[in-house]
Amino acid sequence: MKADLLQRFIFDELDIRGELLVLKKTVQDALSRHDYPQAIQSLLGQALSAGLLLSATLKIKGDTTLQATGEGELRLLMAEATHRRTARGIARWEGAPDSTSLKQLLGNRAALAITIAPQNGQRYQGIVPLSSDSLSACLEEYFERSEQLATRIWLYESNGCWGGLLLQQLPAARGGEYSAENWERIVALSATLTADELFSLPAEEVLHRLFHEESVRVLQEEPASFWCSCSEERTLEVVKSLGREEAFSILDESGEIEMNCQFCLQRYSFGRERIEQLFDSPTLH
């Protein structure tokens, strides 16, 4: 499957939908801005993949944020994906983490939060304790605990590529045991997918190999990319939240107010004239 593409599909005769995703440049662009240890690079690539897969299950316009926190060597793992199939991410750590276990890296008080923020509508957040070693297992536990639609996620990484497969049970039209049997069969078939197949074969061939006895409708593929939503306007909103007294105190001490985006490291610098305009004007411009 080509890199930096998301392929959605649906089983016409079943109440199940799915997604395939392969990322390369998207993750590389997020990693290149920071000096992450190898273990953190791996997990952040998985988180970006998971964020894009989850966001594609939603019909709304807005952002989906996945955030894992704890008190271990890995303090924060965060990925944010949009309905435009763009993503950004960040991680914070201490020491020299080298474990492949997410649970071990996060340590005590580990938790996973998923936040859905529609452009128009009410923000939703669900938080669950994090108790599994892999991110995919933690996400599946989240869906089980939050009593949402049955969802399975497989995440893959190999030779500088990341990706995944997501399955989701739709609200059953037939109901009962018949739908449960369909779901279990499709899950079992999906579990046979290998990283080599996902990263080297076209999406249509991957789906044919997995589900050649099923009726699968392949939807239009969608490009994915790294994109940071930081801007001068948003940064000025942060400056304004400091208050006039604090902002001008920084100006008196440093001659300017400088801020760097934590995701893309873009630098924003504002002199006295711009800050005076900010506090003298009722709106940002």
From Swiss-Prot:
Q: Which GO terms describe its biological process?
A: protein refolding
Q: Under the GO molecular function aspect, what terms does this record hold?
A: protein folding chaperone; unfolded protein binding
Q: How is it modified after translation?
A: Under oxidizing conditions two disulfide bonds are formed involving the reactive cysteines. Under reducing conditions zinc is bound to the reactive cysteines and the protein is inactive.
InterPro entries for this protein: Heat_shock_Hsp33 (IPR000397), Heat_shock_Hsp33_C (IPR016154), Heat_shock_Hsp33_N (IPR016153), Hsp33_helix_hairpin_bin_dom_sf (IPR023212)
Q: Which domain of life is it from?
A: Bacteria
Question: Sorted alphabetically, which CDD domains does this protein's record hold?
Answer: Hsp33
Q: Which UniProt keywords apply?
A: Chaperone, Cytoplasm, Disulfide bond, Redox-active center, Zinc
User: What cellular component terms from Gene Ontology apply here?
Assistant: cytoplasm
Localization terms from the record? Cytoplasm
Q: List the disulfide bonds.
A: C228-C230, C261-C264
- Keyword Transport assigned to the entry: answer is no
SUPFAM superfamilies associated with the record: Hsp33 domain, HSP33 redox switch-like
Signal peptide span: none
Family per record:
Belongs to the HSP33 family.
What the entry lists under PANTHER family is as follows:
33 KDA CHAPERONIN
Role according to the record: Redox regulated molecular chaperone. Protects both thermally unfolding and oxidatively damaged proteins from irreversible aggregation. Plays an important role in the bacterial defense system toward oxidative stress.
Spell out the HAMAP family in the cross-references: HslO
Name used for this protein in its record: 33 kDa chaperonin
